[in-house]
């Protein structure tokens, strides 16, 4: 597999909301590392490093976090983003071991177009999988090209990535191909349309004026 990304972490010495805000102003993101029967470790990393990691490797990224000269294999477990800027305000990491299997939610996307006159409805955005920590897929892509109205893709129909096991309910509906609903006109528009139809009918029924 490709070489893991390595990010330098610094142990935190100050805590609380004020300290976290100061870190973010200085271009740092506070993190907490959990797992493997260790006490939580509070660190901070460069904002650009973490943003690049998540952008390039996804929300389940696995990487080497160096703390005080020691590399720790970790994966992103949860991200807290600013609701306005979408910048990462905080993240939780899970300390893992090579060869360990973990449960992760993997994003699901679809590509292609259904049959003419059909519309695709995606009911779930993620599927829960059990997979080797170093083989976590960034996403699952479903091909919906040419699917007809009434066809569905359930979780059990999704081809699993190598060595991955489906944990989500096998009968969970992922993709549903439906007939588009007719758009209803607002009441005012309907009344106007009916008035126009009635006026057109009256004009058609009116006798033509005789010419002298």
UniProtKB/Swiss-Prot annotation:
GO terms for cellular component: cytosolic large ribosomal subunit. The gene is rplY. InterPro entries: Rbsml_bL25/Gln-tRNA_synth_N, Ribosomal_bL25/Gln-tRNA_synth, Ribosomal_bL25_b-dom, Ribosomal_bL25_C, Ribosomal_bL25_long, Ribosomal_L25_dom, Ribosomal_uL5_bac-type. SUPFAM superfamilies: Ribosomal protein L25-like. Keywords: Ribonucleoprotein, Ribosomal protein, RNA-binding, rRNA-binding. Part of the 50S ribosomal subunit; part of the 5S rRNA/L5/L18/L25 subcomplex. Contacts the 5S rRNA. Binds to the 5S rRNA independently of L5 and L18. Gene3D superfamilies: Ribosomal protein L25, beta domain, Ribosomal Protein L25, Chain P. Transmembrane segments: none annotated. This is Large ribosomal subunit protein bL25. Disulfide bonds: none annotated. GO terms for molecular function: 5S rRNA binding; structural constituent of ribosome. This is one of the proteins that binds to the 5S RNA in the ribosome where it forms part of the central protuberance. PANTHER family: RIBOSOMAL PROTEIN L25/GLN-TRNA SYNTHETASE, ANTI-CODON-BINDING DOMAIN-CONTAINING PROTEIN (PTHR33284), RIBOSOMAL PROTEIN L25_GLN-TRNA SYNTHETASE, ANTI-CODON-BINDING DOMAIN-CONTAINING PROTEIN (PTHR33284:SF1). It comes from Corynebacterium urealyticum (strain ATCC 43042 / DSM 7109). It holds the Pfam family Ribosomal_TL5_C. Residues 179-212 are annotated as: Disordered. One of its GO terms (biological process) is translation. Belongs to the bacterial ribosomal protein bL25 family. CTC subfamily.
């Amino acid at each position: 597999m490709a070489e893991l990304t390595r990010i330098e972490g610094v142990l935190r010495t100050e805590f609380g909301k004020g300290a976290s805000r100061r870190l973010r102003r200085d271009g740092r993101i506070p993190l907490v590392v959990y797992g493997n029967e260790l006490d939580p470790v509070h660190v901070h990393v460069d904002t650009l490093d973490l943003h690049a990691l998540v952008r390039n490797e996804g929300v389940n990224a696995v990487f080497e976090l160096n703390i005080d000269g020691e590399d720790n294999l970790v994966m992103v477990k949860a991200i807290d983003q600013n609701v306005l800027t979408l910048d990462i305000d905080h993240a939780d990491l899970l300390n893992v071991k090579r060869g360990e299997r973990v449960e992760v939610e993997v994003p699901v996307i679809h590509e292609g177009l259904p049959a003419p006159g059909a519309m695709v409805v995606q009911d779930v955005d993620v599927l829960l999988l059990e997979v080797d920590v170093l083989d976590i897929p960034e996403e699952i892509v479903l091909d919906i090209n040419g699917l007809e109205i009434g066809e569905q893709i359930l979780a059990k129909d999704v081809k699993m990535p190598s060595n991955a096991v489906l944990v989500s309910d096998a009968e969970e509906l992922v993709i549903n191909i439906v007939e588009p609903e007719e758009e209803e006109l607002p009441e005012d528009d309907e009344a106007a349309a009916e008035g126009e139809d009635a006026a057109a009918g009256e004009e058609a029924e009116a006798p033509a004026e005789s010419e002298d």
